[in-house]
Regions:
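Short, conserved charged micro-motifs
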Residues: 161-169
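Residue-level signal for secondary-structure boundary sites
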Residues: 78-80, 162, 192
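Active-site nucleotide-donor binding segment shared across nucleotidyl transfer reactions
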Residues: 119-152, 156-162
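Broad gene-expression machinery/nucleic-acid interaction feature
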Residues: 67-69, 149, 153, 181-183
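Solvent-exposed residues in well-ordered beta-strands and their adjoining turns
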Residues: 73-75, 157-159, 187
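Mature, function-bearing regions of proteins
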Residues: 82-84, 88-92, 199, 205-223, ...
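Conserved catalytic core of two-metal-ion nucleotidyltransferases
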Residues: 174-211
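Helical scaffold of the NTase/Pol beta-like nucleotidyltransferase catalytic core
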Residues: 2-134, 173-180
Length: 233
């Protein structure tokens, strides 16, 4: 998977939603030897050996505290299953989600105008969109994840309220004018994320939205979204 972003070790920074993990193939095979049922699932046995990433998932109560919670999403042709796994921290390297500009070539032809407009929007409001969902996995693996019903799932890092307001002022119009539903989240400086549509529809000074992190979900007043400091790198 081509990605110009720097690789981080797990200990170098907190894991964030939608981070990708590159797994050492020998460690992958060792994991499968301990969980042989996984090796029988389509595509899973050779996943790491082909260079495919896995994705960070929310930690569950049964996960080992020292393990990295991850998931393997299979394409629709293989049941669209999301397989939960846990990996030792020493066998993975962390990559941020793929930039939209790097995933654009995997997008359907009908989406290309919308993708170009979204990239222009990112430049105009001073943020850089990244992808998750079907477009990410189509680009990362070359497997057929996109269907006629797929959304375009985007992550928009928003360092401050000014950029958030400018972004939310433009996204609904771009979606209305384009061929694809724009789903996704704004990424707050502290690593938490909120669906952009939910913030756009929030009304009044006391409005709350659902905020997600790798540790769980919680309701948060819109007015307090930027109250927490960004984590140290």
């Amino acid at each position: 998977m081509a990605n110009g972003d720097p690789v981080r070790s797990v200990g170098a920074a907190l894991l964030r939603r939608h981070d990708l993990l590159r797994v050492d193939p020998s460690a992958w095979n060792a994991m499968l030897s301990r969980q042989p049922a996984l090796a029988d699932l389509p595509l899973v046995a050779g996943w790491a050996g082909r260079g495919y990433p896995v994705i960070v998932r929310r930690r569950l109560c049964g996960d080992d505290a020292d393990a990295v919670p991850a998931a393997v999403p299979l394409p629709p042709s293989h049941g669209k299953r999301r397989i939960a796994i846990a990996l030792p921290s020493g066998v993975v390297a962390v990559l941020p989600p793929l930039l939209l500009r790097d995933a654009a070539r995997a997008a359907p032809r009908a989406w290309q105008g919308a993708v170009a407009a979204l990239l222009e929007l990112g430049q105009a409001v001073e943020t850089t969109p990244r992808v998750f969902g079907a477009l990410l996995w189509e680009q990362a693996t070359g497997l057929p994840y996109l269907t006629g019903a797929s959304d375009l799932d985007l992550i928009w890092p928003v360092p401050d309220r000014r950029i958030l307001d400018r972004l939310l002022g433009a996204l609904p119009r771009l979606e209305a004018d384009g061929p694809v539903r724009l789903d996704g989240e704004v990424l707050l400086p502290d690593g938490r994320a909120v669906q952009w549509r939910e913030i756009a529809e929030a009304r009044g000074p006391s409005a709350h939205v659902l905020v997600k992190s790798v540790d769980g979900v919680a309701m948060c007043p819109v007015a307090h979204l930027f109250a927490r400091a960004a984590p140290a790198a």
